[in-house]
From Swiss-Prot:
Reactions catalysed, as given in the entry: L-glutamate 5-semialdehyde + phosphate + NADP(+) = L-glutamyl 5-phosphate + NADPH + H(+)
Keywords per UniProt: Amino-acid biosynthesis, Cytoplasm, NADP, Oxidoreductase, Proline biosynthesis
Species whose genome carries this gene: Campylobacter curvus (strain 525.92)
Cellular location(s): Cytoplasm
Gene symbol of the encoding locus: proA
GO molecular function: glutamate-5-semialdehyde dehydrogenase activity; NADP binding
The protein's name in its UniProt record: Gamma-glutamyl phosphate reductase
GO BP term, example: L-proline biosynthetic process
Listed HAMAP family: ProA
CDD domains in alphabetical order: ALDH_F18-19_ProA-GPR (cd07079)
Pathway assigned to this chain's UniProt record: Amino-acid biosynthesis; L-proline biosynthesis; L-glutamate 5-semialdehyde from L-glutamate: step 2/2
Top-level division of the source organism's lineage: Bacteria
Family: Belongs to the gamma-glutamyl phosphate reductase family.
Function: Catalyzes the NADPH-dependent reduction of L-glutamate 5-phosphate into L-glutamate 5-semialdehyde and phosphate. The product spontaneously undergoes cyclization to form 1-pyrroline-5-carboxylate.
């Protein structure tokens, strides 16, 4: 019998015990796990260092190494997220509605767990703790399958969760890690419809496409984040630059960082000039139309000449690094690309109508924003952009379960069925009807 089959059977068997686990016991487990994360911070970092060294030797990109790293701040954030989940009201058994049938039967709709969750994810070891905490709070068992790059970190974190949880009644098998790093293990796991109720992939496009195309289990797709920010002509330029800077540079390897900025044609050169000055270390890939417009206004641009931006303290260099950004002419393939690095595509549009149309056809329907002071344009954008999260005058970096008050997330769903956006405890439940009668027949 395979490792995964044993894990899946044990997870399914734990579901009934999880239903009987009290809200108090769940909170005790989660608070104890949070305390243990902080107490064992150095041991966690030591396990993580093994993964980081292996990743460096394997030539992982800076973006992937950033996702992989567990710093003091990230471990503290994990612990705080678990504590937040522990504070949530109990959702299992929540009454969602009810009515009396004409024949006297009482019909009640209640919230129940999904069952066994299968989480397949890449790089980020914090997902192990986030997923386990949210699964427990929502009454679900969870099978975790992380990447080979994070195997030491994931083993340590899942063992910590289980050893701590067992002291307070966590059922055996309720939180499990598939330790096999063979790709065949994923292929086996995604066909176990008898034991696993839903799959939630978190990773790159290739992983998600493989699971969607081959799974025999329902999948909640957590899509890539090709996030856009549209700067309207009425936007406060200084504020817009600060928001874009945050959305691109705070943590560029995340799915909620901005990948493309659309500039209203009437303010495009002004905003691009400010971005070029302020976004240190960022490569701005400028669409050819805006590239020409920029050159017409500020002097001829050449791949080996400096563009002296009059009235600015900084000098922006075309095609090479400077104290500000690096400007290069974009290829069409740059638009619609998730860079996950300090690269930003920039394009100008005629107004909000073109911005909406462009985003709906080029984004991954994750998180998109408008920066504007025009109420009508803001409302048009928020209503028409078909994404899981839409913003007015705020950074896309807030698309996060913790920031939304969920205490972490199982993923950010970009599909429309079962859940959409950051998925917290409630999104990991479904419903059932309880009908109480007194001998009624039809």
């Amino acid at each position: 019998m395979s490792e995964i089959l044993n894990i899946a059977k044990a997870a399914k068997a734990s579901c009934e015990q999880l239903l009987n686990l009290s809200a108090q016991a769940k909170s005790q487990i989660l608070n104890a796990v949070a305390d243990e994360l902080v107490r064992q911070k150095e041991a966690i970092k030591a396990a993580n260092l093994l993964d980081l060294k292996a990743g460096e030797n394997a030539g992982l990109s800076a973006a992937l190494l950033d996702r992989l790293e567990l710093t003091d701040a990230r471990i503290e954030a994990m612990a705080n997220g678990v504590r937040e989940v522990a504070k949530f009201d109990e959702v299992v058994g929540e009454v969602l509605g009810g009515w009396r049938h004409p024949n006297g039967m009482q019909i009640t709709k209640i919230r129940v767990p999904l069952g066994v969750l299968g989480i397949i994810y890449e790089s980020r070891p914090n997902v192990s703790i986030d997923a386990a905490a949210l699964a427990l709070k929502s009454g679900n068992a969870v099978i975790l399958r992380g990447s080979a790059a994070a195997i030491s970190s994931n083993k340590f974190l899942v063992n910590l969760f289980n050893e701590t949880g067992a002291k307070f009644g966590l059922p055996k098998g309720a939180v499990a890690l598939v330790e096999s790093t063979d790709k065949e293990a994923v292929g086996e796991m995604i066909k176990m419809h008898e034991f696993i109720d839903v799959l939630i992939p978190r990773g790159g496009k290739n992983l998600k496409d493989f699971i969607i195309q081959n799974a025999t289990i329902p999948v909640i797709e957590t899509g890539a984040g090709v996030c856009h920010i549209f700067v309207d002509e009425s936007a406060d330029v200084r504020e817009a630059v600060e928001i874009i800077k945050n959305a691109k540079t705070q943590r560029p390897s995340t799915c909620n960082s901005v990948e493309c900025v659309l500039l209203h044609e009437r303010v495009a050169v002004k905003v691009l000039t400010s971005l070029a000055r302020e976004l240190d270390g960022v490569q701005l890939r400028v669409h050819e139309d805006l590239w020409a417009k920029f050159g017409e206004n500020l002097g001829e641009i050449s791949g080996d000449l400096d563009a002296n931006l009059s009235g600015l303290k900084a000098e922006v260099k075309i095609g090479e690094s400077s104290n500000g950004a690096q400007l290069v002419k974009a290829d069409e393939s740059d638009f619609g690309t998730e860079f996950l690095s300090l690269v930003l595509a920039v394009k100008c549009v005629s107004g909000v109508a073109e911005a909406v149309s462009y985003i709906n056809s080029h984004s991954t329907h994750h998180s998109d924003a408008i920066l504007s002071r025009d109420y009508a344009n803001i409302e048009r954008f928020l209503n028409a952009v078909d994404s899981a999260v839409v913003y007015a005058n705020a950074s896309t970096r807030f698309s996060d379960g913790g920031e939304f008050g969920f205490g972490g997330e199982i993923g950010i769903s970009t599909q429309k069925l079962h859940a959409r956006g950051p998925m917290g405890v409630r999104e990991l439940t479904t419903s059932k009807y309880v009908v109480r009668g007194d001998g009624q027949i039809r």
